[in-house]
């Protein structure tokens, strides 16, 4: 194939992208062959939708005459020429306000929803907090279906400094209303002409995930948290039952990934704990809870106490993090002594908030002795 007057830097970028795709395919194929799996063989995908990079000085220049403009080198069908384009004023103000002085990479062309955009990337080095475990303040987060997120600010001794219920009911109502329209349309006309409606519902769900992640990170920063603790929700499997659509739309991994990016930029760390029995076990150690049949957010403990199930789970999430971090650096003899006095901390899937309070008390007594 001949590419008339194609710049050498664009040609090199295309060649490197192709080599990277081939190398990735070979690596994935070797790993697949080692596992002896019958299905899921990697495929060499040719349509990678690679977009060109506008290298600075040779393809991209900032416009000296217009504050919110730029000059791009484009091919007009005959020759490569410089064209002046106007950029969004609000976007450029955001970049000038938040990313001035940071190391900027070359902008990349991006196509979304049949429109083209310039994606600007910046590099920033942020030191993460190194606060000792006993001095840490954490924000334990329970992501749920009924309430979007329940956050608890906690110290290592179990002291609760703050609690917050994060929910966006109007956004969820809007999305479910769109899903209802899709369902009614599909019953009448089939599923052939609802692609745009599903795309709209997906965008609403993505925006909901952004708002939840921003609210969680903002609350953690407001309370000077060192670590944001989540449940490990990377499990995969077939989903069935009445709540199948709700579970498919639940963007738990996307929310955690967005929180991780935002927290790292603010200097906070992210940690995950085992999710087993965090909601099933009561935080006070009384045993399993019984959820209300009409309102799954509320539950009854074995001792008759009525409580919010998601709030109890957020206590247990924070407790499991501190139990793990407090026991990890101890010598084996000291750890065995503490586990003998608090047997429930041996199995992490059965640890609750009451076990953290008891463990911390035993550690203080052992240190005093």
Where are these regions (language model features)?
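Nucleic-acid substrate recognition interfaces
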Residues: 1-369
């Amino acid at each position: 194939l001949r590419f008339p007057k194609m710049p050498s830097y664009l040609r090199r970028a295309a060649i490197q992208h192709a080599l990277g795709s081939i190398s990735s395919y070979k690596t994935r194929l070797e790993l697949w062959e080692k596992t002896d799996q019958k299905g899921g063989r990697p495929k060499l995908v040719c349509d990678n939708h690679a977009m060109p990079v506008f290298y600075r000085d040779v393809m991209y220049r900032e416009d000296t005459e217009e504050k919110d403009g730029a000059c791009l080198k484009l091919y007009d069908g005959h020759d490569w020429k410089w064209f002046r384009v106007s950029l969004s004023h609000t976007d450029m103000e955001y970049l000038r306000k938040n990313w001035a002085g940071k190391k900027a990479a070359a902008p990349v062309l991006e196509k979304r929803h049949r429109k083209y955009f310039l994606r600007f990337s910046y590099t920033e080095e942020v030191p993460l907090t190194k606060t000792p475990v006993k001095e840490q303040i954490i924000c334990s987060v329970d992501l749920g279906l009924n309430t979007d997120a329940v956050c608890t600010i906690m110290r290592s001794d179990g002291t609760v400094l703050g609690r917050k219920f994060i929910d966006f009911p109007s956004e969820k109502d809007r999305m479910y209303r769109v899903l209802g329209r899709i369902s009614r349309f599909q019953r009448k006309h089939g599923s052939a002409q609802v692609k745009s409606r599903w795309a709209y519902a997906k965008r609403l769900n993505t925006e909901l995930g952004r708002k939840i992640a921003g609210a969680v990170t903002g609350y953690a920063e407001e309370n000077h948290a060192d670590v944001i603790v989540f449940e490990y929700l990377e499990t995969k499997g077939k989903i069935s039952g009445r709540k199948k659509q709700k579970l498919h739309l639940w963007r738990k991994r996307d929310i955690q990934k967005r929180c991780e990016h935002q927290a790292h930029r603010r200097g906070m760390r992210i940690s995950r704990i085992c999710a087993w029995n965090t909601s099933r076990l009561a935080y006070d150690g009384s045993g399993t809870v019984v959820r209300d049949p009409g309102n799954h957010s509320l539950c009854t403990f074995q001792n008759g106490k009525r409580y919010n199930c998601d709030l109890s789970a957020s206590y247990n999430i924070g407790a499991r993090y501190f139990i793990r971090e407090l026991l990890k650096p101890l010598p084996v003899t000291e750890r065995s002594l503490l586990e003998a006095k608090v047997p429930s901390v041996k199995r992490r899937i059965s640890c609750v908030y009451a076990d953290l309070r008891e463990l911390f008390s035993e550690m203080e007594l052992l240190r005093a002795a």
